[in-house]
Structures are given as C-alpha cells and as structure tokens.
Amino acid sequence: MTNSNLRTENHFDYVKITLASPERVMSWGQRTLPNGQVVGEVTKPETINYRTLKPEMDGLFCEKIFGPSKDWECHCGKYKRVRHRGIVCERCGVEVTESRVRRHRMGFIKLAAPVSHVWYLKGIPSYVAILLDMPLRDVEQIVYFNCYVVLDQGDHKDLKYKQLLTEDEWLEIEDEIYAEDSTIENEPVVGIGAEALQQLLEDLDLKEIAETLREEITGSKGQKRAKLIKRLRVIDNFIATNARPEWMVLDAIPVIPPDLRPMVQLDGGRFATSDLNDLYRRVINRNNRLARLQEILAPEIIVRNEKRMLQEAVDALVDNGRRGRTVVGANNRALKSLSDIIEGKQGRFRQNLLGKRVDYSGRSVIVVGPKLKMHQCGLPKEMAIELFQPFVIHRLIRQNIVNNIKAAKKLIQRADDEVMQVLQEVIDGHPILLNRAPTLHRLGIQAFEPKLVDGRAIQLHPLVCPAFNADFDGDQMAVHVPLAIESQTEARMLMLASNNILSPATGEPIVTPSQDMVLGSYYLTAIQPEASKPDFGDQSKTFASLDDVINAFEDKRIKLHDWVWVRFNGEVDDDDHGEPSHSETLEDGTRIEQWNLRRDRLDEQGALISRFVLTTVGRVVMNHTIIDAVAIA
C-alpha cells in the first residue's frame, strides 16, 4: 500500500520482544552512507553548539548519524532544496533527506567494557542468577567489583569453578602461585565485573543443562523440585527464542532517535532537555574516560573503579533507582530513565499505544439511577448531542429542517426543541457501550439503551455495579457509540446488561442486590410491631386492587407500614396450617373462611370466588414492582 509520498507501509501481525544480540544492537544504529562511509557510533557527550545552535558532530544530536535537523539541508548549508535528495555532503558528511528521519534513525555507543543489563540482574526473578544457579547477592558482588570469581580452577586444589574470592584471598593465592617452590603449572583464572559474568554465561551449554535438569526433576520433590523447574523454564525459553545468555551483558548500547528525546529552546534563551540526554551524557563521559585510561595503561584499581562507574551509569540509563543511589537532576528530581518512559499508567504502552483517544466517545461521573430499567442508562443531553451529532445532522437534513451541515450545526448549538426531538428519535433503539476502567473481565464493557437526562452525570442502574466493580463515590465511566449496524446488533444481542446476569468466571449470578437495595427491600417489607391490624371492611383500610393501595399511598392517605386488606387473586404463601380461625356460610350458599392473614370466599363446591389478604402497604409496593418488571421482561 503506497501513499502520496511513495512510502511503503509494512503490515505486521504482532510485536515480539526478545533479547537483542550485540550484532543486532549495532545494526540498529550502524548505517553505510551512499559514499561508503559507515556512521552510527556516538562518541561525544555534546548535544548542540550553544553559539550556532546546530548539533555537534558525533554527539547525541549528530546530523551525520541521525539525519538533518532541517528538511533537505545539510549541516554546513552547502546543499539546500529537495533537488539534492540522497546526496551526501562531501564537506560535512550529512545525507540530504527529510528531517523526520530523526524520529526513527538510531545510533549506538560502543562500550569500552561490557556491562550487565540491570533488568536481568536486578529484576524479580533475577534471570542471571537463575541461569548461573548462584545467589543474587554473589552475582552482584561480581558485577559491582566487590569479589573475584573463579573462571577456571587450573591445578589449584582448593579452588572451585564459580567460587567467590575477596581481594585479600586472591592476593594470597597469587603469592602461592608465583612462589619459587610452586608446583602449579596450569594457573587458575579469575575474573571480576561484567566481563567475568559474560564469560560465565558463555560457558553455559543450555541444551545439556536442560537435559540434566529434566533428569534431576524426576527424582526430586518439594522446594528443590520447584527451584529446578524454575531454572528449566528459563533455559527452555532461551532455547525456544534462540537467545544466548551472554546477550544479557551489553557490549554496545543503542541510542534512541534524537526527536524522541528533544532539546527545545525556551523564551529566555535557556534550553529544556529530556532527562535521557543527561543519562546518555553520563554514559558517554564515563565510557570515553575508561577508554582513555585503558589506552594509557592506568593502574588496575583506577580502571576497575571507572568500569564500576560505567556500570552504574548504564543502570541509571536503563532503570534509574533500580539499584544504588537514584540519579537526580536540578532541584533534586529523579531523572526519567528508559524504563520510566515505558512502564506504568503514564508509560508508552498504556498511555500512547493502548490508550489512544477514540472518536464518538465521552467520559463522565456516574450517579445512581434507581428508576431506570436494568438495560437502560441515563445519558446527559449535552453528551448525547455531541456523540450522536452526525446522526442528528443527517436526520435534520433528511427531514428538510435544514439544508446543509453548517445550518444543522448552528441549530444544534442553539439546542433547539426540534433538535432535541430529532435526538430522541436517533437514540431510540441505538445502544451505547459503557466501560469502566480497569476492564478486568468481559463484563467491564456492557451495552445499554440510553435515556436522555438533565445534568452532566451518567446514570447507572445499581444492579449492574458489581459487574463493573463500580460505586458512586466519584467513579467515572466512558461511553462509546457503536456506529455500524453490525456492531449495534452485536451490542444489543451479546452485550446488553440484561443479558449478562451470570459471571463468566464462576457461572454464579453477578447481578445480586446489595447494600442500599437490600436495606431498602428490608425497610419496604418490614412490619412495625406497634402497627394495629384493621378489621375487614374498614373503609379506610380495605382496597379492591393493588393499584388502589398504591394510589392511596401516593395520595398520603395511608403510610408505608400500615396494615391493609387488599383484594388479590394471585398465589399467596400458605403460612396458615390447620383450620381457619372463623368459618361462616352465607344465605346464597357461599362460604367465608377467615384465616390469620387472609379472607377467602368459596362457592358450594369449595372453589375460590375472591380473596382478600392482610398485608402492609410496603409489601404491596414491592409485589407490584416485581410483577411489573417480570411482565415487561
């Protein structure tokens, strides 16, 4: 697929994150220019020249490595304009191209000594420690130059492979080796720092270790077995991804493109820069100093100290604060490392890649809507008019209320009555999706029929709260409008709240009344001990139907907990056992039976003619509500 700039778009299925080999790290940043020159290595800590405000060559913003900072213009200004596309300036070595290449071209820093990757060393679990089958404390002692490690015991009987030695212990062994009467021919080899770690990891034969571990697992149990399985799992993953353990030790560090760590000039002439530039500068300074010390054959203790400082600088770049003191900038603020940019809610993945803004969506606080049906939600008019605007405009034009989109938008801004009427027509039967973050299971997004409400809060039925894990203490929910007919149908058929009664995890009902609803139901159906029961036929307390009771309650002629006689032909609980308390045969042959909480009139054959029950007004309200809800459902 090609667009107007003739750029090819690569379609991909997935993103896979694996360990990168040193060669691959170099290949990300290393490029061969059309004139045959190889560029990519960042060797200077400088960013820009403060007099010319142009990037320094071979620095962190170098135009030769990352591309020109102005479209179609080289560093020295010899070549300008698009007609010189692809030419490499013979004076400054900058390729004439678009400046946007500075968003994706990378560089690299070739390290004077290997350094360990802090994620694999200090992560939980520590993969380096698991692979080497050593305690993490011991591995740290090696990496941060506190202890030597035996890489080859040679002819020395007291040494073992991977044994740790302090400085004093190694000096004693050296004296022993180089003594005049020494019988040791094959000298032991020890190492320190990330170089020693790299050597230990290189010595691992993963396939052989995996076979040995499988044999050991069959004959072991308990905690030892769990530890072996843990190690085997890590080794199997390395084998499956064709990654080598020594790649966890870095020989080169990639430098991300300069436009992703920009430097901008402020009004006062000062510069604001990304924290990454400071962290990269520390690494380059220490790396260059180490290279110079190695060149002049400086004493081992000085070189070793510089290597440790380089290790700490790379640790801070990758994950500041994971180990040791946190590197701080001006006003004692911790610098944001690569890990800080990637991880967390504000990180690159959750904020920018997964959390993109979506058209036809809104967000507002939720409040309880007890008068709603379970499949309904209250949508503020202000939100609805914005979300359904294209549909409203289309209908306004189709009904010849307006002639064009501009006139329709003006009418909508005035919130005309006609607009509200059209909006009501549009949302009828058009489901919307409500989502509450975090969406931990499929019931985190459900469909509802919108009902227009005043105010600015979304109204939600209290019964659907457990599915969303929502409460009404300031929670917010997002609204999405399904546009296509297919998506609307799916929302109605599969996602409607009244169709999602059971939890997908347990199969038990997730729609269960709780808190206020339980309390309300209890209060509604409670019996007041001091309330007196009326006699049958009392005009103020005897009613012909449930509706009459509710009308009398709404007119405030009776109270919620008053006892009433009401005619009711439905099923009742047979809470009376034995004989009726009073029985009487009338002149027409019919019989009256008086029970504790009901009064029945039966014909000569004993069939029920009419029934009055003694109950409270609250119970009538509850019963009437349930019957209405079931009848609609």
UniProtKB/Swiss-Prot annotation:
Cited Pfam families: RNA_pol_Rpb1_1 (PF04997), RNA_pol_Rpb1_2 (PF00623), RNA_pol_Rpb1_3 (PF04983)
Matches recorded under NCBIfam families: PRK02625.1 (NF002729), rpoC1_cyan (TIGR02387)
GO molecular function: DNA binding; DNA-directed RNA polymerase activity; magnesium ion binding; zinc ion binding
Reactions mediated catalytically: RNA(n) + a ribonucleoside 5'-triphosphate = RNA(n+1) + diphosphate
The protein's name: DNA-directed RNA polymerase subunit gamma
Lineage of producing organism: Bacteria, Bacillati, Cyanobacteriota, Cyanophyceae, Synechococcales
Keyword DNA-binding in annotation: no
Domain of life: Bacteria
Gene Ontology BP terms: DNA-templated transcription
InterPro entries: DNA-dir_RpoC1_gamma, DNA-dir_RpoC_beta_prime, RNA_pol_asu, RNA_pol_N, RNA_pol_Rpb1_1, RNA_pol_Rpb1_3, RNA_pol_Rpb1_3_sf, RNA_pol_Rpb1_clamp_domain
GO cellular component annotations of the record: DNA-directed RNA polymerase complex
Function: DNA-dependent RNA polymerase catalyzes the transcription of DNA into RNA using the four ribonucleoside triphosphates as substrates.
Family: Belongs to the RNA polymerase beta' chain family. RpoC1 subfamily.
